[in-house]
Amino acid sequence: MKNVKLLLAGMAITMAACSPQKQAEEPTLKDVFKDKFLIGTAMNTWQVAGLDTAAQNVVKKHFSAIVAENCMKAEEIHPEKDRYNFAAADSLVAFGEANGITVTGHTLIWHSQCPRWFWFDENGELVSPEVLKEHMREHIHTVVGRYKGRI
């Protein structure tokens, strides 16, 4: 009985001393599909700024493309007729470039998340089709011009 206990103790020590083999790391989503298509996700300003580091790390590891969740929508990037706010959009593009992630464009103007001035004049009346087309042209040219070749 004493020999069995010694044998078991020796086996336990031997097994404890053996380190487990390093398991093979699972391939990332972007690596699995790299020869077929980009794997993308939307990013919000908190993630881009590094305030949600867990999400940012998942994006860096698994995704080959990003798109702005909201920071490039007209309401955010062009809040007033003569004022643009590119800070958050610039950060998103810089994050993609710094991490080798393709930045994908999104709808520049749509029915939702567009500033009120885009559709209505200072009297609260709908702008004319001509004025609306000019707002659209100016907005599109400004945003596309700023990020040309980067998105």
Task: Tell me what each language-model feature is.
Residues 1-29:
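Bacterial Sec-dependent N-terminal signal peptides
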Residues 24-27, 84, 127:
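Short coil/turn linker and secondary-structure boundary residues
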Residues 3, 38, 102:
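Residues at the starts of beta-strands that form the adenosine-phosphate
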Residues 43-53, 74-87:
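Acidic-and-aromatic substrate-binding clefts and catalytic sites of carbohydrate-active enzymes
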Residues 13, 43-44, 99:
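Short alpha-helical scaffold segments that flank and stabilize functional sites
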Residues 65-79, 88-151:
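Substrate-binding cleft and catalytic face of glycoside hydrolase catalytic domains
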Residues 23-55, 59-65, 69:
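Boundary/entry segment of secreted carbohydrate-active catalytic domains
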